[in-house]
């Protein structure tokens, strides 16, 4: 069956809840699950946060949020035209919802060597929690 907003699926040992992110481009879903250690992880999908998804995001311990570029470089990369967010956008959301851990992914790759430092530096202006900016194939202990 095709997914619907709020559907649950058992994947490995996890009860995964899928939610429609209300994309204006194409139908897309995020998901939320509780890890074996009791922590809640939410993946917002490949577009900016939509407030109608709040019940899936609020009270999570880990938020995976796309952050296409630094806010200070938004005029260069034009993330909003591509239906994407900036580091500032993701960090302000995580701060407002008091989410302790934020994973920023789906970033532009013009400065991979400096990306983590730059994204964390900008992010800390808007967010007091833990910021992770993984490289491809990185592992993060949840």
Label each PLM-derived region with a short phrase:
Residues 2-55, 136-142:
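Core dinuclear metal-dependent hydrolase active-site scaffold
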């Amino acid at each position: 069956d095709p997914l619907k907003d709020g559907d649950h699926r058992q994947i490995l040992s996890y009860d995964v809840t899928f939610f429609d992110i209300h994309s204006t481009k194409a139908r897309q879903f995020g998901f939320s699950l509780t890890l074996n250690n009791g922590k809640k992880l939410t993946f917002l999908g490949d577009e900016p946060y939509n407030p109608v998804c709040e019940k899936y995001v609020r009270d999570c311990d880990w938020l995976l949020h796309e952050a296409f570029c630094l806010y200070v470089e938004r005029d260069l990369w034009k993330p909003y035209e591509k239906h994407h967010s900036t580091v500032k956008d993701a960090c302000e959301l995580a701060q407002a919802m008091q989410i302790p851990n934020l994973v920023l992914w789906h970033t532009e790759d013009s400065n991979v060597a400096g990306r983590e430092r730059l994204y964390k530096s900008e992010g800390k202006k808007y967010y007091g929690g833990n910021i992770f900016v993984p490289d491809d194939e990185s592992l993060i202990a949840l």
